[in-house]
Amino acid sequence: MPPIYMNIILAFTLSLMGMLVYRSHLMSSLLCLEGMMLSLFILGTTMALNMHFTLMTMLPIVLLVFAACEAAVGLSLLVMVSNTYGLDYVQNLNLLQC
């Protein structure tokens, strides 16, 4: 396995570990989730370029679109929670149910 793939997988693993450690704060969870999506984007792009697989070149762009939608929803949820409660704890999300 080339070292670039090892570095990307290590970045994904570190983001996953950060997501598990900082799961009580919404902002930290969103940042770790964005790190995971970015490492998956880079991994998909490098694999598509190295394998010369033309059908796979659209996959990283679709992943980037979903990551942007996830970031927009996450940031709007963060703003709503912080305006309502003043804190960004994930446990406050249960209180927002109708």
From Swiss-Prot:
Protein location: Mitochondrion inner membrane
Gene name of the encoded protein: MT-ND4L
Name of protein: NADH-ubiquinone oxidoreductase chain 4L
Native organism taxonomy: Eukaryota, Metazoa, Chordata, Craniata, Vertebrata
Alphabetized GO MF terms: NADH dehydrogenase (ubiquinone) activity
Quaternary structure and interacting proteins, as annotated: Core subunit of respiratory chain NADH dehydrogenase (Complex I) which is composed of 45 different subunits.
Family: Belongs to the complex I subunit 4L family.
Membrane topology designation: Multi-pass membrane protein
Main subcellular location of this protein, as a coarse class: mitochondrion
Membrane-spanning segments: 1-21, 29-49, 61-81
EC numbers for this chain: 7.1.1.2
Catalytic activities: a ubiquinone + NADH + 5 H(+)(in) = a ubiquinol + NAD(+) + 4 H(+)(out)
Keywords assigned by UniProt, alphabetized: Electron transport, Membrane, Mitochondrion, Mitochondrion inner membrane, NAD, Respiratory chain, Translocase, Transmembrane, Transmembrane helix, Transport, Ubiquinone
Record's keyword annotation contains Transport: yes
This protein's GO CC annotations: mitochondrial inner membrane; respiratory chain complex I
GO terms classed as biological process: ATP synthesis coupled electron transport
